[in-house]
Amino acid sequence: MILYHASTMYHLLCCIVHKLAYHPNDAAELLMLEYIKPDKSRKSFLKQVIDSGFFTTARYVPEQKFKLKKGNALDNTSSEKEIKSVIENISKTFENWLDEDITKFEEIYVASDQHSLGIYLTSKSIPYHYFEDASGMLSEQSRYLSITKSNNMTNHIINEYLGCMGRNSCVKSKLCDLRHQQKGFYDEKAEDFCIYDILKFKIPDKVPDIINFFGGISHKIRGDKKICLYLTQDLNTLKIKDLDLQELMMTTLVDYMCGDEYVLVVKPHPKDR
């Protein structure tokens, strides 16, 4: 049996594509962070995931409840004993919640290993495969670390101590889109995982099912103009909360990249409201 873990809709896409391409006939369980969807739509979305048949079973990881059992918050002055205590609290809480023998899974694929599953696996020296957090992010870990540090210092301290984000010896491989990494990037554990290529060359017959699952709608754009596809960003995650600033950033980018010779097509971010 295979275990997949997703913390964002992008990660869910990675898990679905990987499952269909490399483990089409294997039973698989999917764990999703509860934050992947707003509270009011979680129940219906979980049913949608299960009904899709991509995975044998699926459930949410209640990270919010786990936070209450971590213990004291950590900072740069925390001792190793204090750090280990918090890690042990998280691991025990996750293990009790999982209520399964983790060794039954032949392979484990984890996205965002700085959360409870990744902390549990790393602290117990259990091997797993790591999905990069976003396309091209494996080569920009310093930027990613700065974001997580500003979001939660306790998590940052644990990340550094355990070597989360794919930086520890438990990691068997790092699945990433090699063409989108920074120039000169090299990692001996990096394995090319390009969703576009896999969909086009390995599982083209599954593309309609995947598009339908994510609510994709085909649009025919008429005319001779070139197409500019704009993928919006969840700026709130980057601590850019001012709506006027968000609007300025978006309009400036569109004005710069999309001239009159283009038709602008906007693909909303999954967290856009």
List where the protein language model places each region:
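Residue-level signal for short, function-critical loop segments
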Residues: 34, 134, 234-236, 270
